[in-house]
């Protein structure tokens, strides 16, 4: 069986954080979170990385993140632009926001002919997540006419921030770790001993326990999902252009839920023992720096994650 591929979603505008957080250094050697992700994926058995980026950051991205990909991994670049639409569709006037995670994955279709995982560029998922995902993708095949998908799940309390709201896919799982549904909650805030979400700009709030299982967009798919994404995109556009032309997004969890409902796929929730870390807001950065420093100290990572021909000059981080 082919080694699985890793599709990294790096085209987001970083509207809440500001700047290109995909390239923001998190240690004195200049590594960003994305470097740790690629390193973990390679040692777990992934053989290819597909970066989904915007043309506007291509040069900087290739000279930094792209240049640091470990030897032995195939590297591809796909481009998510707001005007990457099916024939007959035009960008709504005033639209600058990308069309969402499912559209980003669809942009990688020309480079995918093997099982693959999808991650966010600016999320740290932990070593174990890549191991369990690689094991799943290399050991599961279609059964009873259903394509085997997977997701690494995390407890909500381990994924919220003190510094603002987050967006999470809230999961319903059966006793066999099979996903029943994902509901996207785009505005979740942390409280003292739980979280709350709103769908009406704060007019009303509903409670979510910290042990609620959520998706952090770490999915594993078979190549067939690309055709499903392509078929579903026009229907999404028809609705979004009518109801929310400037901010409507095509989400991976929504597509996955539809395929589960239609009996075309099953989705197993994989258990990872590792903590998730991310930088949604600038104030989150120091906690990520501290966590990665602790992982280097305990031997999880060596100082340099990449093979380089010349020494890397340590840099200051702030």
Set out the residue ranges of the language-model regions.
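Conserved alpha/beta core of the MobA/IspD/sugar-nucleotide pyrophosphorylase nucleotidyltransferase superfamily
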Residues: 173-175, 182-305
């Amino acid at each position: 069986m082919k080694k699985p591929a890793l599709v990294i979603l790096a085209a987001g505008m970083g509207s809440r954080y500001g700047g290109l957080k995909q390239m923001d250094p998190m240690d004195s050697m200049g590594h960003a979170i994305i470097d740790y992700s690629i390193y973990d994926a390679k040692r777990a058995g992934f053989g290819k990385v597909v970066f989904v980026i915007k043309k506007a950051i291509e040069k900087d991205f290739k000279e930094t993140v792209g240049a640091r990909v470990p030897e032995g991994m195939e590297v591809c670049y796909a481009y998510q632009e707001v005007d990457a639409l099916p024939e007959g569709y035009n960008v709504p006037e005033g639209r600058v926001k990308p069309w969402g995670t499912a559209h980003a994955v669809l942009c990688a279709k020309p480079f995918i002919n093997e099982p693959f995982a999808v991650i966010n560029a600016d999320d740290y998922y932990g070593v174990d997540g890549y191991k369990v995902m690689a094991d799943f993708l290399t050991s599961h095949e279609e059964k009873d006419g259903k394509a085997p998908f997977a997701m690494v799940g995390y407890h909500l309390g381990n994924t919220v921030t003190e510094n603002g709201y987050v967006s999470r896919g809230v999961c319903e799982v059966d006793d066999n770790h099979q996903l029943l549904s994902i509901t996207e909650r785009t505005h979740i805030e942390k409280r003292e001993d739980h979280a709350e979400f709103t769908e009406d700009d704060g007019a009303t709030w509903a409670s979510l326990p910290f042990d609620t299982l959520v998706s952090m967009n770490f999915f594993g798919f078979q190549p067939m999902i690309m055709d499903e994404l392509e078929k579903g995109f026009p229907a999404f556009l028809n609705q979004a252009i009518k109801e929310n032309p400037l901010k409507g997004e095509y989400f991976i969890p929504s597509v996955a839920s539809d395929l589960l409902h239609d009996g075309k796929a099953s989705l197993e929730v994989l258990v990872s023992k590792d903590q998730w870390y991310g930088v949604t807001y600038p104030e989150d950065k120091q906690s990520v720096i501290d966590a990665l420093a602790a992982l280097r100290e305990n031997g999880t990572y060596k100082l340099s994650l990449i093979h380089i021909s010349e020494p890397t000059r340590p840099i200051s981080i702030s």
